[in-house]
A protein has these predicted regions:
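Alpha-helical cap/lid subdomain in secreted, periplasmic
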Residues: 20-22, 26, 42-175
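Serine-esterase "nucleophile elbow" of acetyl-processing enzymes
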Residues: 1-53
Length: 175
């Protein structure tokens, strides 16, 4: 039976054709534009009812939270992980870092949040996929080639960087 991947989170998950990129697996894309961590947590029971026994679960959430200057979502993120681990005991759970975004009021918020996400990953024994440095240009700002004009959503090239990182660092361990 083909491996099963569950991708959950915000528009950064939703807007890519993961199934086309990974044709040898069954991909369940439950990304939702505008999603916050709280929104994902509220949708999670329905997702768990619909997707049984995935081999891999990848989460990208929090970008919309920090864009609204909501930094309390990390507690919600821990609840998401706990629920996934309870229902998908055999799955490899991958927490992605947030990506660099150029919103003037954020300052160093994304790197600070990413350090907290990495701590959560370590304490919950999940895989942390640090995409942040891969999306920086030589000027240590978001590499414009990887983004759409809005500076938040990814271009085809940006999604390819993400997919290659997943292939290189996570998929080999699935066997």
């Amino acid at each position: 039976m083909a491996r099963r991947f569950l991708f959950i989170g915000d528009s950064l998950i939703e807007f890519f054709r993961w199934q086309k990129r990974f044709p040898d697996v069954k991909v369940y894309n439950f990304g939702s534009a505008g999603e916050t961590a709280e929104g994902l947590l509220s949708r999670l029971p329905n997702i768990i009812d619909r997707v049984k026994s995935p081999d891999l679960v990848m989460i990208m959430t929090g970008t919309n939270n920090i864009a609204m200057e909501d930094y309390g979502f990390l507690f919600t993120y821990e609840k998401i992980i706990a629920l996934l681990q309870k229902h998908y005991e055999q799955a490899t759970i991958v927490m992605t870092s947030l990506l660099p975004i150029e919103l003037f009021f954020l300052g160093d918020a994304v790197p600070r949040v990413n350090r907290k996400l990495e701590d959560i990953s370590r304490s919950t024994n999940t895989v942390y996929l640090d995409l942040y440095p891969l999306f920086l240009g030589e000027d240590s700002k978001a590499n414009g080639a990887y983004y759409e004009a809005d500076g938040v959503h990814l271009s085809k090239e940006g999604y390819e960087v993400w997919a290659r990182a997943l292939e290189a660092s996570v998929l080999p361990s699935l066997g």
